[in-house]
Amino acid sequence: MGRANKVVLAYSGGVDTSVCIPYLKQEWGVEEVITFAADLGQGDELEPIRQKALDAGASQSLVGDLIQPFIEEFAFPAIRANALYEGRYPLSTALARPLIARRLVEVAREVGADAVAHGCTGKGNDQVRFDVAIAALAPDLKVLTPAREWGMSREETIAYGERCGIPAPVSKKSPYSIDLNLLGRSIEAGPLEDPMVAPPEEVFAMTSPMSDTPDAAEEIEIAFEAGNPVAINGQVLDPVAMIREANRLAGSHGIGRLDMIENRVVGIKSREIYETPGLLLLIQAHQELESLTLAADVLRSKRQLEMQWADLVYQGLWFGPLKDALDGFMDRTQQHVNGVVRLRLYKGNATVIGRGSTQSSLYVPAMASYGSEDAFDHRAAEGFIYVWGLPTRLWAASQRTSG
């Protein structure tokens, strides 16, 4: 008897997930493999996937359009949380995994599968994200992980696939592993594994090389309501269109490239190249608007919790209790994050040059001004400073006495 009867495999069309199809059937005795590929805004990349999975031995090849929930339910909460893993990476890949896992479980229920599978290796982050999410959503489903167990090198995996009639998609000329969705691209492997090797221009697709960016700066305005971006330059956009337009604007100016050494969940460091033009632009604008509309103590607390929120998502704990609790905090803070941020885009940089809110601004010109309209009570400062500095004076006096 095989490890499962009917399996739904999370399918990308890459080497590992393609080889998983014959491997599950031939090596693990799975009777039927159904593949599911998520359309997350990859574009034309998904067109050949259906037939490729069928050619590899899948009984059904399903593709699901998840673009709208991806942006509304995953990307927008990340913008509201200013989610930047290790202060830099806006989680463009990590945000997709809990959504794929959720839909994978739903498909398994619909087709009566007794297991799900993925093609993640044993040293990556995605295996953690998929396994933990599936365990939270459907603890009764088996999770099969052939790529984690088969012990084959990448070359051996490609050779196994070729014996099963699966062509190798990666050539020596292009040795990179690329993950793509509407939020961005992640590029790794090949010569990029040497952290001293500069990424060649050929690995980028969403951002213009600096030599091709406009020589004139472009100023734009992004409007937010309840923490969500809703308009660019006065044009109201739905969430998906918002990301597309932000990608276009930022990418055309070469904004959104990241080259970083990243600490993976499994404990190793990896070199990652990311392109996330629109998401980084929107997070930057959102942060700036919060500085205008949130009280100081709320803002300080939120900045600390943002790091924890990003860590939880990166570590595959989207469906965990702490993430759920932090969502409540984030949502509550966003009620008054309404307004407009003006940015100047130029040669790889987005610079905030203005911000305003007619509804929620806590910036009071009469209090901030040093001119004749100054309404701040300067006389009150003396008493405030006396009380504020009292602990310091008492401590200093005790040091003089003991010394």
UniProtKB/Swiss-Prot annotation:
SUPFAM superfamilies, alphabetized: Adenine nucleotide alpha hydrolases-like, Argininosuccinate synthetase, C-terminal domain
Binding site for L-aspartate: T121, N125, D126
A GO CC term assigned to this protein in UniProt: cytoplasm
An individual GO BP term: urea cycle
Keyword Cytoplasm among UniProt keywords: yes
Ubl conjugation among keywords: no
Compartments reported by the entry: Cytoplasm
Pathway linked to the protein: Amino-acid biosynthesis; L-arginine biosynthesis; L-arginine from L-ornithine and carbamoyl phosphate: step 2/3
Catalytic activity annotation: L-citrulline + L-aspartate + ATP = 2-(N(omega)-L-arginino)succinate + AMP + diphosphate + H(+)
UniProtKB keywords: Amino-acid biosynthesis, Arginine biosynthesis, ATP-binding, Cytoplasm, Ligase, Nucleotide-binding
Annotated L-citrulline binding sites: Y89, N125, R129, S177, S186, E262, Y274
Residues annotated as binding ATP: A10, Y11, S12, G13, G14, V15, D16, T17, S18, A38, G119
NCBIfam families tied to this protein: argG (TIGR00032), PRK00509.1 (NF001770)
Family (UniProt): Belongs to the argininosuccinate synthase family. Type 1 subfamily.
Protein name: Argininosuccinate synthase
Source organism of this protein record: Parasynechococcus marenigrum (strain WH8102)
